[in-house]
Regions:
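Short clusters of hydrophobic/aromatic residues that line enzyme substrate/ligand-binding pockets
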Residues: 21, 27, 31, 63, ...
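Conserved ATP/PPi-binding loop(s) of AMP-dependent carboxylate-activating enzymes
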Residues: 1-36, 70-72, 168
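General small-molecule cofactor/ligand-binding pocket signal
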Residues: 91, 141-144
Length: 192
């Protein structure tokens, strides 16, 4: 109740308190409701034959292509099985017909002759098609010298997405990356 000016009353700050309560409820709902008494990180994982756990990526990294929800982690896992591939990252790019198309940034173990790039691209899409299905084949593949990563090793997909969308003016601060120089190299390759 508002008492107006010059009246003694009790103070209650609803907006601050309500935000705290909502944040706590949202936090519990997001991280503790998926599995009883367990914290859900949002990461996918599997256990290999040696008992080791491998984090496969965010389960919410999903790109909708022609009405199909495609997770980036399984596609990247298929790509990374290629003998010449060191690592990969997939982002979605708007497409007139499909809604989104798949854009792959791929780092090779050894710098191959650029004449073999087309063969490697075909091999990669065959692997994806065989393991996941033809809908998951990449529309664009770019071989890059490295992927932008945080100091903890997380691939900065946000930056890769912006480069793929030709939005390089809004990359944000890249100086804190483990390898900030790779961003310029990727931009030079992609937007040449």
């Amino acid at each position: 109740m508002d008492l107006g000016l010059s009246h003694l009353g009790q103070q209650a700050i609803w907006s601050y308190l309500s935000k705290l309560i909502l944040v706590e409820l949202s936090y519990k709902e997001t991280y503790f409701s998926a599995f009883k008494n367990k914290y859900f990180t949002g990461d996918g994982a599997y256990r290999d034959e040696n008992g080791f756990y491998r984090i496969t990526g965010r389960v919410d990294d999903v790109i909708i292509v022609s009405g199909h929800n495609l997770g980036t982690a399984p596609i990247e896992d298929a790509i990374n099985e290629h003998d010449l591939v060191a690592e990969s990252a997939i982002v979605g790019v708007p497409h007139e017909i499909k809604g989104n198309s798949l854009f792959g940034y791929i780092t090779l173990k050894d710098e191959s002759n650029s004449e073999t790039y087309n063969d490697i691209k075909k091999d990669i899409n065959q692997l994806i098609s065989k393991q996941i299905g033809p809908i998951a084949k990449l529309d664009r593949i770019e071989f890059v010298p490295g992927l932008p990563k945080t100091r903890s090793g997380k691939i900065m997909r946000r930056i890769l997405r912006k480069i793929a969308h030709d939005d390089i003016k809004n990359l944000g601060d890249v100086s804190t990356l483990l390898n900030p120089e790779v961003v310029k190299k990727i931009i030079d390759l992609i937007l040449k």
